[in-house]
Amino acid sequence: MNFGERVHLMRRRKKMTQKELGEAIGVSKTTIFRIEKGDFADAMGQHIAKMARVLNVSADYLLGLKEEPAPLEPEPREQVEQEG
């Protein structure tokens, strides 16, 4: 499974639309569509980290370096409360 397929799979598991994922990471739904279809140029750097965070998987999983989508560690509650 390639990067785009993994993004698509995890987005569907989270019951998110392309628009919702795009809004969560600050890109258009067209960008998410292109990423899922294999145009990885749009997914470099900060977008990969943001997608992993929103989808609650490691960047290594999205990049195909790990086979299992291990969830990320939750942020400490006090840090989340300070940011909100």
Range-by-range predicted roles:
Residues 5-24, 50:
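Short basic helix-loop element that most often maps to the first helix and adjoining turn
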Residues 26-42:
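Recognition helix of helix-turn-helix/homeodomain-like DNA-binding domains
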Residues 1-5, 72:
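A detector for short, charged/polar N-terminal pre-domain segments
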Residues 36, 47, 66:
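DNA major-groove recognition helix of helix-turn-helix
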Residues 26, 46-61:
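DNA major-groove recognition helix of helix-turn-helix/homeodomain DNA-binding modules
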Residues 64-84:
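Short, charged recognition helix plus adjacent turn
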Residues 7, 21-22, 32-35, 62:
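Conserved hydrophobic/aromatic packing and binding residues within compact polymer-binding modules
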